[in-house]
Amino acid sequence: MKNLSFPLLFLFFLVPELLGSSMPLCPIDEAIDKKIKQDFNSLFPNAIKNIGLNCWTVSSRGKLASCPEGTAVLSCSCGSACGSWDIREEKVCHCQCARIDWTAARCCKLQVAS
């Protein structure tokens, strides 16, 4: 019976918690949860928490669309139902089909919130 006591305790106490509970947390559980979140958040410097991604679309006629300096291309779109494109030098979208009427580049840069 001694060999079964630990597995039974595990099943009796921990498994219901893993399955979820509709009951609110008791004050001790809330305190533990709060401490875990604080410790987890302290792993990341505040500067990292305030970094975001600022994106917009640049389009042009023809098969090339360029993003401004300081930004990078994340994706491209091509006119004339062309789905074949590549990114050149991290800032230029190039549509590879013949007779492309327009090309669009999704340009993004990191932005630090104040």
From Swiss-Prot:
Keyword Disulfide bond belongs to the record: yes
Disulfide bridges in this chain: C55-C108, C67-C107, C76-C93, C78-C95, C82-C97
Protein's name according to its UniProt entry: Resistin
Entry-linked InterPro entries: RELM, Resistin-like_sf
Described purpose of this protein according to its UniProt entry: Hormone that seems to suppress insulin ability to stimulate glucose uptake into adipose cells. Potentially links obesity to diabetes.
GO terms of molecular function: hormone activity
Expression across tissues: Expressed in white but not brown adipose tissue in a variety of organs.
Gene: Retn
Similarity comment text for this entry: Belongs to the resistin/FIZZ family.
